[in-house]
């Protein structure tokens, strides 16, 4: 996918990895970048606008845990303004296994609901033009960080959902791929709670191992967007971008 002159919606585009990715996207010259985030950050939006004045950067407050109907209303506003949207990035995520329901609601259900909502505008069975979805999942969807099993399971669920979306592309016209960052130096990983406090030092222990910067992750994210491979499972770890070949242990046969 060519980012230049495209219209992109980025859910949680002002977070750690999100903000650096928004910067890299803006540098690539889309026509519009619409940022949806729970917390307003006027300084960050102003920075993105200044980074490339030719790009129209717009912000809307959005909590991924709202009902699908509310998301559809917001998306209608955006589609009425832009007419077309080429790419949806679902990037909302929290890491706190003390908040079980919210972790699942943000990391998994929010991704499902936002995706479901945009299908009203994209699904070719409804006369839509199709589109592309990039879901930010995690390497913990491959192998869990067992001290945070709720977070890891939520990301595994998001990965499975994304893989299914890709296989439905011939029906819906909507393609999808997953972005799976490794341990990245963000506020998210500097301090977080393990499930039932099984390992109070889990954040500290993780950061003792090699990590990557948000900029490294963002630059590889943009490469994945440009590659635009339906069904791709991208691993963004230690400054590298690698396509993962998923081992099939079972097939439904349908």
From Swiss-Prot:
Gene3D superfamilies: NAD(P)-binding Rossmann-like Domain. One of its GO terms (cellular component) is cytoplasm. GO terms for biological process: alcohol metabolic process. Keywords: NAD, Oxidoreductase. InterPro entries: ADH_Drosophila-type (IPR002425), NAD(P)-bd_dom_sf (IPR036291), Sc_DH/Rdtase_CS (IPR020904), SDR_fam (IPR002347). The active site is at 151 (proton acceptor). Substrate binds at residue 138. It catalyses: a primary alcohol + NAD(+) = an aldehyde + NADH + H(+); a secondary alcohol + NAD(+) = a ketone + NADH + H(+). Coiled coil: none annotated. NAD(+) binds at residues 10-33. Homodimer. Belongs to the short-chain dehydrogenases/reductases (SDR) family. This is Alcohol dehydrogenase. It comes from Drosophila differens (Fruit fly).
């Amino acid at each position: 996918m060519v980012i230049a002159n495209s219209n992109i919606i980025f859910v949680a585009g002002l977070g750690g990895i999100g903000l650096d990715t928004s910067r890299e996207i803006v540098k690539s010259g889309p026509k519009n970048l619409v940022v949806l985030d729970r917390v307003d950050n006027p300084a960050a939006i102003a920075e993105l606008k200044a980074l490339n004045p030719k790009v129209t950067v717009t912000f809307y407050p959005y909590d991924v845990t709202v009902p699908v109907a509310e998301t559809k209303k917001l998306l209608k506003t955006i589609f009425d303004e832009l007419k077309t949207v080429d790419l949806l990035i679902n990037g909302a995520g929290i890491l706190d296994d003390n908040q079980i329901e919210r972790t699942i609601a943000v990391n998994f259900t929010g991704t499902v609901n936002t995706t479901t909502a945009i299908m009203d505008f994209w699904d070719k069975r409804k006369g839509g033009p199709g589109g592309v979805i990039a879901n930010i999942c995690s390497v913990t969807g491959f192998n869990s960080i067992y001290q945070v099993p709720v977070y890891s399971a939520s990301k595994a669920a998001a990965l499975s959902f994304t893989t299914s979306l890709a296989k439905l592309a011939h029906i819906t016209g909507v393609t999808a791929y997953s972005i799976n960052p490794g341990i990245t130096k963000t506020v998210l990983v500097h301090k977080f709670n393990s499930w039932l406090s099984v390992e109070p030092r889990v954040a500290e222990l993780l950061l003792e191992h090699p990590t990557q910067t948000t900029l490294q992750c963002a630059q590889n994210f943009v490469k994945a967007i440009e590659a635009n491979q339906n069904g791709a499972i991208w691993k963004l770890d230690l400054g590298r971008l690698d396509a993962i070949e998923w081992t099939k242990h079972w097939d439904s046969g349908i």
